[in-house]
Amino acid sequence: MANEKLLEIKNLTVHYQSHDATVHAVENLNLSLGNGETLGLVGETGAGKTTTVKTIMRILPTPPARVVSGEIFFDGQDLLKISEKEMRKIRGKEIAMIFQDPMTSLNPVMTVADQIAEVIRLHDGGSRAEAHKKACDMLELVGIRPERGSDYPHQFSGGMKQRVVIAMALACNPRFLIADEPTTALDVTIQAQVLELMKKLKAQYQTAMVMITHDLGIVAEICDYVAIMYAGEVVEYGTREHIFNSTAHPYTKGLFACIPDIFTEQNELVPINGLTPDPTDLPQGCRFNPRCPYATERCRQEHPENVEIEPGHFVACHLINGGGNENA
């Protein structure tokens, strides 16, 4: 993790309360990120990735969501303790988010330039003309002709809409960008274009970024650090090289085993058995133990702690941390 931390999350726990149960969405999460770095949050649906970033943005619906404990420091300021008025000055200006589905992220009755200009005027001020000019400049930056700023969202393809959303997120030069599966709704060729664009803009503006994805190919392409999440917890954290070259946790190994490898003669993919646990009724001990082929009695009884197995590489697994098979 970086010496100069822009973002630092400490012991974050977030629950959702239903009429008859508590959903344990995120439990005791610890992460940090430095200026200009990219962190990949990887895991299956329901791992707690989106809840984590929405907590950073403070856009979780409350109720039913509730931050039980923890701190989120951005540039030394705890975002969970400031007022909503103060947070509005940060949200969109210092911290911006690219949402998962560009089709539903844009207002259908406003031109795309007006939508970008609205963000610019809210945070940077200036006249309508100045904001509109900058909005058109941002469209050009993401590869859209400025004259198309007068068009409405329905006049753009899915990939072009995602470019508009990226332009809107970057309009105020945020120091920290959150991208929630920004390429999920796009076809493969457009995915590649959008990723290349994000890499270029990240380098140009030195923006720190959290990328939520379940695609390890995207992680390899764009991330410096990786946090593998399972059932609300980070089970493995390290640099991209740690995760790809020194995979340690059985769950992480299971994710890689699900990916076709053109360099082997393997004929079948090896899926991870079972399903993610019910977040209202989590298993005792390690949360992955019901699906883990190497689980021991200790795994079923004791919750594993995160241990640093090499500098900067953390794993929460009894098999790695002592008392089990290190080659699991």
Cite the ranges covered by each PLM segment.
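P-loop NTP-binding/switch modules centered on Walker-like glycine-rich loops
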Residues: 58, 178, 182, 186-267
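ABC ATPase NBD coupling module
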Residues: 79-96, 122, 242-247, 277-283
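Short catalytic/signature loops enriched in Gly
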Residues: 5, 149, 239-328
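A short, proline-enriched helix->beta-strand linker immediately N-terminal to the Walker B motif
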Residues: 171-175
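Conserved ABC ATPase signature
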Residues: 151-156, 160
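Conserved ABC ATPase "signature" region
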Residues: 71-78, 129-147, 256-257
